C-alpha cells in the first residue's frame, strides 16, 4: 500500500535555492498551517509535480514555478524536489526531479535537467539509481503508487485553483470523470475489438480462397514428386550397372598401372646405369690427374696416412696454440703500456688541479682570519690572538660570534613581545569604550523601533476598535434576544409535541401487529398446502418403507461378511453400526502413522547404510590408489638407483646412497679447489721471478741460470697441476651429477615415506571403523524392515475393510435418512387426522387476514412520514436556534473586543511615553562616551608608530650582523670541506702513483721486445711444416678417388644384372597395348549407361526445377499453415465477439456500481457535514450520450425536498467548496484502494463557522474509521488556526508544520508541537 514518507524542497517558488526544506508526512494526519502567501500551496504543487510531472496552473511553462534568478541575484537558479514514498508493494523508492531556470538576455529559459528513481536492492542492500526521461518518469510513478495519473491529479493532489472542478462546465467535468474511470481507454478498446472483428471476418474470406488455390497446387506437386520417384528408380538401376563397369575399368587400370610402373622401373634402372657410368668416367679422369700431380706416391695404407695426418695436426695445433698465446700476451703487454701512458697523463692533470686548490685554500684561510678580526673589532666582542689561527681557535671565536647573534635575536623577540603587550592593552581600552558606546546606541535604536511599532499598533488598534463599534452599531441585541426566545419556545413546543405523539411506540405496535398477521397467514398457507399434498404423502410413505427394508438387508449382509475381520482388528470387540467405520478409520490412521514412522526410520537407516557403503567404497578406492602410487614410486626410485649403481638396489638404501653421494661430491670439490689454488700460486711465482729476478718466497736474488732453472721447474709443476686439475674437474662434475640425480629423487622418496607411514595406515584404520559401523547399521536396518513388513501386512488387511465399511456406512446413513423422512410423513398424516378445516374456510380466512395486513402497512407508512416531517421541523428549529445563539455570542464577543481594544490603546500610550523618556536619557549619555572613544583611538595610533620605529632600528642592526656572520660561516665551510675531502693527502698519493707508473712502464717495454723475438722464431717453424702436410693430403685424396671408382664399377654391374632379371622393355610395352584395348571396350559400355542416366536425371532435374518454383515451394507446409491460420482466425474471431460483449457489459456494470458507491458516500458525508437546511443531499448524475456508445455526461445535482436541481450556478461559494471536497473524499474512498493519500488545500475557504466545524468533525470521523488502515494519510493545508486546532489532535499527530517567511522573504518550514 503506497504512502508518502518525506519530501525535500529547494528552489521552488519562494523556497531558498541554497537551503533544503524537509517535510515528513505523518499517519494518519499531516497538518500544515501558515499565513497567506507563506508558501503552503507550494507543498501540494511539489507533491503533484513529483508524482505526475504536471506543472501547477498559470506556471508560465515553469518560469514562475522556479525561484526567480532576478530575486536571487543570479543568472540561473537550480531547484530540486526529492520525494520518498512506499510503493503499492511496500518498497521504499525515492523520486528526484531537478530543474533549472536561466536568465537569458531577453527571456528566461526553463529546463527539467534530471529525473531519477532511487531504490534499495533487496539482495545486496546497495542503492540503485535509474535515470529516466520526464515522460517515462510520469508513467512510472503512478504505476508504482498503484493509482492512475488522473486520480493523482484530480483527487489526491488537487491545486487550490482547480479544487472546484466538480462544479465547472460540463465538458471539463466529463473529461475529468472519463480520465478517472479510464472510459476513453476502454471505449477505444471496444472500438478496436469491433474493428478487428470486422477485419478478421474479411480475412477469413481471403484465407478460404487462398486455401482452395493451395489445394490445387498441392495436387500438382504430388504428381511431379511421383514422376521424380519413378525416374529415380530407373536411375538407380543404371547406376548399379555403371558401378560394375567402373569396377572392371578400375581393375584394368590397375593392371595397366602395374605394367607402366614396371616399365618405369626398367627405364629408371637404365637411367641410373647411364648416370653412374658418366660419374665413373669423371672420377677415373680425376684419379689420373691426381696421380700425375703427386710428388711421390706413399706406400702406406689410408689408415696409416690418416693417423699420420692426425698426429701431425696435433703437433701443428700445439705450435699454433703457443703462437696464439704469445700473440695474446704481446697484445696484453701493448694494452698495459697504453693504459700506463694514459694513467700517467691523468695523474699529471690531477696533480696540477690539486696544487691549484691548495693555493686557493691558503688564501681562503687568510681571508677568514681577517673577517674574524674585523667582527671582533666592530662589535666589541673582545681581544683575539695573532694570525694565522689554529682550527681550535677558529672554532672558539666562531662560537662566540654565533652566541652574540643569538643574543641579538632574543633582544629583537623581547622587543616585539613588549610592543604587542602595550598595543594590546591600549586597544582593549579603546574597544571597551567603543562597546559601551555601541551598547547605548543599540539601546537607543531598539527603543526607537519599539516606539515606531507601538505607534503602528495604536493606529491598528484604533482601526480595529472603530470596526468593532461599527459592527456593534449594526446589531440589535434586544431583537436578537427576542428571536432566540421565540425560536426556543417553538423548539420546545415541537419537541414536546413529538414526544406526546409517541411515534416510536405506535410504529413498534403496528410492526408487531403486522408480524402477528404474517405468522397467521403462513400457518394457514401451510395447512392449505398440507391438505393438497395428503394423498401424495401416503404413497411416499409406503415407498420409503420398502426402500428402507431393502437397504437394511444390504447393510446386514456386508456386516456379516466383515464381522470376523473387524473383531480381529479391534481385538475381539464389535462396535455399534454407526461407529464402525469411524473406529476402523481411526485404527487405519493409527497403523498408517506407525507404518510411516517405521518407513521413515527404515529410509534413514538405509540412507545411513548407503552412506557408509559409499564411504567404504571411497576409502577402498583411496587405499587402492595410495598403494598403487606407493608401488609406482618404489619402482621409479629403484629403477633410477639401479641405473646409477649398475646393480640391484632396494628403496631402503636410498638415504644412505644420498648421504654417501653428498660426501663424495664435497670431497671431490675440495680436492679440485685445492689443486686450482696451487695452479693459481705457480703462475704468479713465475711472473714475479721474471720481473724481479728473485725468489718469490725467500726474496733471494737469481743469477740468469738459476732464474731459467726456476722458471722451467715452475712450468713443469704448472703443466702437471693443469692435467691433474682437469682430471679432478671431471671427477667433481661426475660426483655432482650423481648427487643431483639422487637429490631429484628426494621429493618422490618423501611422498613414498608419507604414503607408507601416515596415509595408508590412516586409511586402513578408517576402513576398519566404517566396516564395523556398517555391520551395526545393517543389523538395525534388518530389524526395522522386519517390523515394517509386519505392520504393512496389518495395514493392508485394514485397508481391505475400509471400502466395504464405507459402503455399509453410506447405506446406514441412507437408512437413517429414510427413517427420518418416514417419521416426518407419519407425523404430518397423524397431525392432519386431528381435525382440519375445509379449503373454502381457509381461503376466506386468508383473504381477511391479508386485507388487515395491507391496512396496517398503510397506517405504518403514514406514521413514519409524520415522524420524518416532525423531525425535519425540529432540525430546522434547532438550526435557527443555533444561528441566533451564534449571532448573540458574536455580538457579546464584539463588545468584549471593543473593551479590550480600548484597554490595549491605554496601555500602548503609557508604553510610548515611557519609551520617549528612555530615548532622551540614552541620547544624553552618548556624547561623553564618543569623545572618550576618539581620544583612546588617537593614543593607540601614536604608540603603534613609535614602537614600530624602535623595533625596525633593532632589526636592521641584527640583519647587518647576521650577513657578516653568514659570510664567515660560508668561508669556514669551504675550508672545512677541503680538510674533510683530504685533498692534501690525495695530492701526495697521486704523486706516489705517478712514480710507480713510470717504473711499470719500463718493465713492460722490456717484456714486449723479448716476446717479439720468440714469436718470430715460432712462426718460421710453422711455415716449414705446411709442405709436409700438403704431401700427406694429396696422397689421401688420390687413394679416396681410386676407391670411389672401384665402388661405382661394382654398382653398375649390379644394376645391369637387375635389368636382365625383370625382362626386356619391348615385351612390357606390348602387354600394355593389349590391356588398353580391353579398357576402351569397357569405357564405351560405361558411357552408354551414363547417357541413359543423364536422360533420367534431366527429367528429374526438370521436375525438381518446376517443384522449386515459388508456387510449389513448401506447398504442404503452406497448405497446412493456411488451414491452421483459417481455423485459428475463425476461433479468434468468435472469441473477439465474446470479449466485446463481455467487456461492454462489464464496463456498464462497473460504471453503474462505482457511481452508486460514490453517490452513497457523497450523501452520507453531505448529511454529516452540511449544516444548512436548503439542501437534503447532493449526488452525481450520469447519462449515456448514445445507444451505440458507452460515453457518459455528468452533472452534480442537489436534492431539496422532492425537487432535484442542477447544483452548478445555483450554489454559494461555500457550498461549492464543500461539495467539491465531499466529491473528492468519495472518489478517494472509491478509487484509492492501493493509495490512501488525500491532500486538502485550504478546505475551509468560503465556509462559515458551523460548516467548518462539521467539516472538521467529518475529517475526524474519517480518520477514526481509518485508524486500522496503515496507509491512510490525510494532508491538510490551512490558514485557519481554529480549524487546525479542531482537527489537529494529539491522537492523530505528534507535530504539525508552520510555514512562514524569514528576513530574506524565503519560505521556511518549522515543526511544532501539536495543539493541546
UniProtKB/Swiss-Prot annotation:
Q: Where does the chain bind Zn(2+)?
A: 695, 698
The residue ranges of the Zinc-hook domain are 648-747
What subcellular compartments does it reside in? Nucleus; Chromosome
Q: Which PROSITE patterns does the annotation name?
A: ZN_HOOK (PS51131)
- At which positions is ATP bound? 13, 36-37, 39-42, 66, 68, 160
Q: How does it assemble?
A: Component of the MRN complex composed of two heterodimers RAD50 and MRE11 associated with a single NBS1.
Family that this chain belongs to: Belongs to the SMC family. RAD50 subfamily.
* Name used for this protein in its record: DNA repair protein RAD50
Amino acid at each position: 500500500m503506497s504512502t508518502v514518507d518525506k519530501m525535500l524542497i529547494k528552489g521552488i517558488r519562494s523556497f531558498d535555492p541554497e537551503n533544503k526544506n524537509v517535510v515528513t508526512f505523518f499517519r494518519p494526519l499531516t497538518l500544515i498551517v501558515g499565513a497567506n502567501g507563506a508558501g503552503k500551496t507550494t507543498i501540494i504543487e511539489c507533491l503533484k509535480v513529483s508524482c505526475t510531472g504536471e506543472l501547477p496552473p498559470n506556471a508560465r511553462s515553469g518560469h514562475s514555478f522556479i525561484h526567480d534568478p532576478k530575486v536571487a541575484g543570479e543568472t540561473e537558479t537550480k531547484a530540486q524536489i526529492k520525494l520518498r514514498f512506499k510503493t503499492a508493494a511496500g518498497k521504499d523508492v525515492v523520486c528526484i526531479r531537478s530543474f533549472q531556470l536561466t536568465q537569458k538576455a531577453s527571456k528566461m529559459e526553463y529546463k527539467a535537467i534530471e529525473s531519477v528513481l532511487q531504490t534499495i536492492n533487496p539482495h545486496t542492500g546497495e542503492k540503485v539509481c535509474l535515470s529516466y526521461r520526464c515522460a517515462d518518469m510520469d508513467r512510472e510513478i503512478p504505476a508504482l503508487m498503484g493509482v492512475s495519473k488522473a486520480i493523482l491529479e484530480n483527487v489526491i493532489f488537487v491545486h487550490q485553483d482547480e479544487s472546484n472542478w466538480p462544479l465547472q462546465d460540463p465538458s471539463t467535468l466529463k473529461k475529468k470523470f472519463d480520465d478517472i474511470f479510464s472510459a476513453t481507454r476502454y471505449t477505444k478498446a471496444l472500438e478496436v475489438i469491433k474493428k478487428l472483428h470486422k477485419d478478421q471476418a474479411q480475412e477469413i474470406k481471403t484465407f478460404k480462397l487462398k486455401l482452395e488455390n493451395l489445394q490445387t497446387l498441392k495436387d500438382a506437386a504430388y504428381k511431379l514428386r511421383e514422376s521424380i520417384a519413378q525416374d529415380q528408380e530407373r536411375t538407380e538401376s543404371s547406376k548399379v550397372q555403371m558401378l560394375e563397369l567402373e569396377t572392371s575399368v578400375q581393375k584394368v587400370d590397375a593392371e595397366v598401372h602395374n605394367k607402366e610402373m614396371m616399365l618405369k622401373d626398367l627405364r629408371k634402372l637404365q637411367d641410373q646405369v647411364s648416370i653412374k657410368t658418366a660419374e665413373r668416367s669423371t672420377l677415373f679422369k680425376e684419379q689420373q690427374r691426381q696421380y700425375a700431380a703427386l710428388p711421390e706416391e706413399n706406400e702406406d695404407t689410408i689408415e696409416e696416412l690418416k693417423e699420420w695426418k692426425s698426429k701431425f695436426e696435433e703437433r701443428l695445433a700445439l705450435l699454433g696454440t703457443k703462437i696464439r698465446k704469445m700473440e695474446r700476451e704481446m697484445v696484453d703487454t701493448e694494452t698495459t703500456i697504453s693504459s700506463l701512458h694514459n694513467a700517467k697523463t691523468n695523474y699529471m692533470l690531477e696533480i696540477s688541479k690539486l696544487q691549484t686548490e691548495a693555493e686557493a685554500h691558503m688564501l681562503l684561510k687568510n681571508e677568514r682570519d681577517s673577517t674574524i678580526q674585523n667582527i671582533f673589532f666592530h662589535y666589541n666582542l673582545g681581544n683575539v690572538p695573532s694570525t694565522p689561527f689554529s682550527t681550535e681557535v677558529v672554532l672558539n671565536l666562531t662560537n662566540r660570534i654565533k652566541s652574540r647573534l643569538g643574543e641579538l635575536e632574543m633582544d629583537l623577540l623581547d622587543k616585539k613581545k613588549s610592543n604587542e603587550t602595550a598595543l594590546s592593552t591600549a586597544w582593549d581600552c579603546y574597544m571597551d569604550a567603543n562597546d559601551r558606546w555601541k551598547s547605548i546606541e543599540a539601546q537607543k535604536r531598539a527603543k526607537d523601533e519599539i516606539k515606531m511599532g507601538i505607534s503602528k499598533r495604536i493606529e491598528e488598534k484604533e482601526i480595529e476598535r472603530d470596526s468593532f463599534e461599527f459592527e456593534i452599531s449594526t446589531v440589535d441585541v434586544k431583537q436578537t434576544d427576542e428571536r432566540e426566545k421565540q425560536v426556543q419556545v417553538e423548539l420546545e413546543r415541537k419537541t414536546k409535541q413529538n414526544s406526546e405523539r409517541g411515534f416510536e411506540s405506535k410504529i413498534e405496535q403496528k410492526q408487531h401487529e403486522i408480524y402477528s398477521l404474517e405468522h397467521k397467514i403462513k400457518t394457514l398457507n401451510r395447512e392449505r398446502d398440507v391438505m393438497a399434498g395428503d394423498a401424495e404423502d401416503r404413497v411416499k410413505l409406503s415407498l420409503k418403507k420398502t426402500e428402507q427394508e431393502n437397504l437394511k438387508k444390504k447393510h446386514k449382509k456386508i456386516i456379516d461378511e466383515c464381522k470376523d475381520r473387524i473383531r480381529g482388528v479391534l481385538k475381539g470387540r464389535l462396535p455399534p453400526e454407526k461407529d464402525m467405520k469411524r473406529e476402523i478409520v481411526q485404527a487405519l490412521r493409527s497403523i498408517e502413522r506407525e507404518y510411516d514412522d517405521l518407513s521413515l526410520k527404515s529410509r534413514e537407516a538405509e540412507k545411513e547404510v548407503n552412506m557408509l557403503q559409499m564411504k567404504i567404497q571411497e576409502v577402498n578406492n583411496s587405499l587402492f590408489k595410495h598403494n598403487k602410487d606407493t608401488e609406482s614410486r618404489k619402482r621409479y626410485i629403484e629403477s633410477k638407483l639401479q641405473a646409477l649403481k649398475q646393480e640391484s638396489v632396494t628403496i631402503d638404501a636410498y638415504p644412505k646412497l644420498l648421504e654417501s653421494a653428498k660426501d663424495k661430491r664435497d670431497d671431490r670439490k675440495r680436492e679440485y679447489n685445492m689443486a686450482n689454488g696451487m695452479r693459481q700460486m705457480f703462475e704468479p711465482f713465475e711472473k714475479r721471478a721474471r720481473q724481479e729476478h728473485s725468489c718469490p718466497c725467500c726474496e733471494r736474488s737469481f743469477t740468469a741460470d738459476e732464474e731459467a732453472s726456476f722458471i722451467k721447474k715452475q712450468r713443469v709443476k704448472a703443466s702437471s697441476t693443469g692435467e691433474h686439475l682437469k682430471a679432478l674437474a671431471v671427477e667433481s662434475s661426475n660426483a655432482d651429477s650423481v648427487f643431483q640425480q639422487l637429490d631429484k629423487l628426494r621429493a618422490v622418496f618423501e611422498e613414498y615415506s608419507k604414503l607408507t607411514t601416515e596415509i595408508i595406515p590412516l586409511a586402513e584404520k578408517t576402513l576398519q571403523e566404517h566396516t564395523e559401523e556398517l555391520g551395526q547399521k545393517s543389523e538395525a536396518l534388518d530389524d526395522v524392515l522386519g517390523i515394517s513388513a509386519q505392520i504393512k501386512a496389518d495395514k493392508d488387511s485394514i485397508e481391505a475393510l475400509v471400502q466395504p465399511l464405507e459402503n455399509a456406512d453410506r447405506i446406514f446413513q441412507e437408512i437413517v435418512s429414510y427413517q427420518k423422512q418416514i417419521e416426518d410423513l407419519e407425523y404430518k398424516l397423524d397431525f392432519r387426522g386431528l381435525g382440519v378445516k375445509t379449503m373454502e374456510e381457509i381461503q376466506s380466512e386468508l383473504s381477511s387476514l391479508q386485507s388487515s395486513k395491507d391496512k396496517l402497512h398503510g397506517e405504518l407508512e403514514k406514521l413514519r412520514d409524520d415522524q420524518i416531517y416532525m423531525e425535519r421541523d425540529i432540525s430546522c428549529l434547532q438550526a435557527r436556534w443555533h444561528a441566533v445563539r451564534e449571532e448573540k455570542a458574536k455580538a457579546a464577543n464584539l463588545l468584549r473586543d471593543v473593551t479590550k481594544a480600548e484597554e490595549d490603546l491605554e496601555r500602548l500610550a503609557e508604553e510610548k511615553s515611557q519609551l520617549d523618556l528612555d530615548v532622551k536619557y540614552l541620547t544624553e549619555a552618548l556624547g561623553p562616551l564618543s569623545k572618550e572613544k576618539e581620544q583612546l583611538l588617537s593614543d593607540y595610533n601614536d604608540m603603534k608608530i613609535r614602537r614600530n620605529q624602535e623595533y625596525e632600528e633593532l632589526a636592521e642592526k641584527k640583519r647587518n650582523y647576521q650577513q657578516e656572520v653568514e659570510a664567515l660561516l660560508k668561508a669556514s665551510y669551504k675550508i672545512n670541506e677541503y680538510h674533510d675531502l683530504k685533498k692534501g693527502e690525495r695530492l701526495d698519493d697521486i704523486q706516489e702513483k705517478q712514480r710507480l707508473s713510470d717504473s711499470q712502464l719500463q718493465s713492460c717495454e722490456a717484456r714486449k721486445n723479448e716476446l717479439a723475438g720468440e714469436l718470430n722464431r715460432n712462426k718460421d717453424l710453422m711455415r716449414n711444416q705446411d709442405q709436409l702436410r700438403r704431401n700427406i693430403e694429396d696422397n689421401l685424396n688420390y687413394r679416396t678417388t681410386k676407391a670411389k671408382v672401384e665402388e661405382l664399377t661394382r654398382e653398375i654391374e649390379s644394376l645391369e644384372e637387375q635389368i636382365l632379371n625383370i625382362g626386356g622393355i619391348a615385351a612390357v610395352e606390348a602387354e600394355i597395348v593389349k590391356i588398353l584395348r580391353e579398357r576402351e571396350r569397357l569405357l564405351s559400355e560405361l558411357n552408354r549407361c551414363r547417357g541413359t542416366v543423364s536422360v533420367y536425371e534431366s527429367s528429374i532435374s526438370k521436375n525438381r526445377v518446376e517443384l522449386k518454383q515459388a508456387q510449389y515451394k513448401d506447398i504442404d507446409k503452406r497448405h497446412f499453415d493456411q488451414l491452421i491460420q483459417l481455423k485459428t482466425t475463425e476461433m479468434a474471431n468468435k472469441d473477439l465477439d465474446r470479449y466485446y460483449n463481455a467487456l461492454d457489459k462489464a464496463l456498464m456494470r462497473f460504471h453503474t456500481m462505482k457511481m452508486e458507491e460514490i453517490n452513497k458516500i457523497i450523501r452520507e458525508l453531505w448529511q454529516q457535514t452540511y449544516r444548512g437546511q436548503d439542501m437534503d443531499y447532493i449526488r452525481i448524475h450520469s447519462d449515456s450520450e448514445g445507444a451505440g456508445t458507452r460515453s457518459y455526461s455528468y452533472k452534480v445535482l442537489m436534492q431539496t425536498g422532492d425537487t432535484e436541481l442542477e447544483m452548478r450556478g445555483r450554489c454559494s461559494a461555500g457550498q461549492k467548496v464543500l461539495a467539491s471536497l465531499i466529491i473528492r473524499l468519495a472518489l478517494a474512498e472509491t478509487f484509492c484502494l492501493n493509495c490512501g493519500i488525500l491532500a486538502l488545500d485550504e478546505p475551509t475557504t468560503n465556509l462559515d463557522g458551523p460548516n467548518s466545524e462539521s467539516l472538521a468533525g467529518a475529517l475526524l470521523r474519517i480518520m477514526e474509521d481509518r485508524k486500522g488502515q496503515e496507509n491512510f494519510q490525510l494532508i491538510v493545508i490551512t490558514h485557519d488556526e481554529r480549524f487546525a486546532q479542531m482537527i489537529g489532535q494529539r491522537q492523530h499527530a505528534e507535530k504539525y508544520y508552520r510555514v512562514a517567511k524569514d528576513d530574506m522573504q524565503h519560505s521556511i518550514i518549522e515543526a511544532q508541537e501539536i495543539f493541546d
